[in-house]
Regions:
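Non-catalytic connector elements of ABC transporters
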Residues: 2-41, 45-53, 62-63, 247-375
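C-terminal boundary and immediately downstream tail of ABC-type ATPase nucleotide-binding domains
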Residues: 8, 224-252, 283
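A position-specific signal in ABC ATPase nucleotide-binding domains
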Residues: 50-51, 58, 104
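ABC ATPase NBD Q-loop/coupling interface
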Residues: 56-78
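ABC ATPase nucleotide-binding domains
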Residues: 79, 85, 89-233
Length: 375
């Protein structure tokens, strides 16, 4: 079954206004952004827990809310499942009773059949009579999902479902959650402010900032083509830099930055043609900056683009990778405080190149690794 839903709502609160419009289809739409951006408020409006001041919410051609037409379905008639932050399981009820909670108005035989079916699909068989306090974190997540999915929702809402867990458990349950959501086939909206989590769980990511949507795109498009500098910074991208346009062409852009002229690939989906001398923002992923080996002779211009030299002025050891902070051999203040570029190298490369001993390097950045951010 193919799913489609659209959200266009406005809600004024004393210190905050939410005004968003976005749509999504099959799979998982992740609402991503800083705390207080309006993500959970959007879920509450979708669920019918809060009434927007204006707008329209449609799920699979079924109108849940339409201020102009006077439609506002109560939560129990919306067919929306909700997994709350921290799961909010009822501690005094058994696992079976928690899963059955949304089925109270169904005949007893139907209720028992549905609970057994959901628990079997979620691998909860044999836990019917346990209480939430006797379960592992993974089991609690599945019970919360079971309670939300038992009503056969048209839309599943998940509010930071992994935020209360420690990091190793969060990683394993992220994989499990993705498997469950794709296997169940229910359209879902999930809230998080962890971009790794957003990317792993999403089919589409909707970026929120201060009550507005500033980009909505399939996850791969968002990763490589943020719509603006603001989106790049909210995503936590590193090496977000500013320069000046030298020349813009449909396939590439030349950028003046720190006394160099860099060549970048223009956006393949939206050619951006700013005039010469206009300010321009761009980003370079730290893992795509190459250190040129000194035992290989002079770099070949055919294989190495955007050559520059710099000195390591700081570094951080993250176990499997090293993050190096380099200041270029160029006059003027560095572009990021006391450094110009962050470069990420695997630990093995760090050891082979003896980076701990050798602090001065020539760098190369392929033009396809410099990503322009339209203003």
């Amino acid at each position: 079954v193919s799913h489609r839903f659209s959200v266009e709502i406005m809600k004024r609160l004393p210190e905050f206004t939410l005004e968003v419009a976005w749509s999504a289809g099959d799979g998982v739409a992740v609402l991503f952004g800083p705390s207080g951006a309006g993500k959970t408020l959007t879920l509450q409006c979708l669920a019918g827990l809060i009434r927007p001041d204006a707008g329209r919410i449609v799920v699979d051609d079924r109108v849940l809310f339409d201020s102009a037409a006077g439609v506002d379905l109560p939560p129990q008639h919306r067919r929306v499942g909700y997994v709350f932050q921290g799961y909010a399981l009822f501690p005094h009820l058994t696992v079976g009773q928690n899963v059955a909670f949304g089925l109270r108005d169904r005949p007893r035989a139907e209720r028992q059949r549905r609970v057994a079916e959901v628990m079997e699909r979620l691998g909860l068989g044999g836990l019917e009579h346990r209480r939430p306090g006797e379960l592992s974190g993974g089991q609690r997540q599945r019970v919360a999902l079971g309670r939300a999915l038992a009503i056969d929702p048209a839309l599943l809402l998940l509010d930071e479902p992994l935020s209360a867990l420690d990091a190793p458990l969060r990683r394993s349950l992220r994989d499990e959650l993705r498997t469950i959501l794709s296997g169940w086939g229910t359209a879902a909206v999930l809230v998080t402010h962890d971009f790794t989590e957003a990317y792993q769980l999403a089919d589409r990511i909707v970026i929120y900032e201060r009550g507005r949507v500033i980009q909505s795109a399939p996850r791969a498009e968002l990763l490589w083509q943020p719509a603006s500098e603001a989106v790049a910074r909210i995503m936590g991208l590193r090496n977000v830099l500013r320069g000046t346009v030298v020349k813009a062409m449909p396939d590439r852009i030349q950028i003046s930055w720190r006394g160099l002229v860099l060549e970048a690939v223009n956006s393949p989906t939206r050619s951006y043609l700013p005039p010469p001398d206009s300010p321009i923002a761009f980003f370079i992923r730290p893992e795509y900056v190459r250190l040129i080996r000194k035992d290989r002779g002079s770099p070949d211009a055919a294989h190495h683009m955007n050559l520059m030299r710099g000195r390591i002025v700081g570094e951080s050891d993250f176990g499997t990778v090293w993050s190096l902070r380099l200041r270029l051999d160029a006059p003027g203040p560095p572009s990021q405080g006391d450094f110009d570029l962050e470069v990420e190298v695997p630990r093995l490369v760090y050891e082979i190149l003896e980076i701990e001993r050798d602090r001065h390097w020539e760098l190369s950045i392929h033009r396809g690794s410099i990503h322009v951010l339209p203003t």
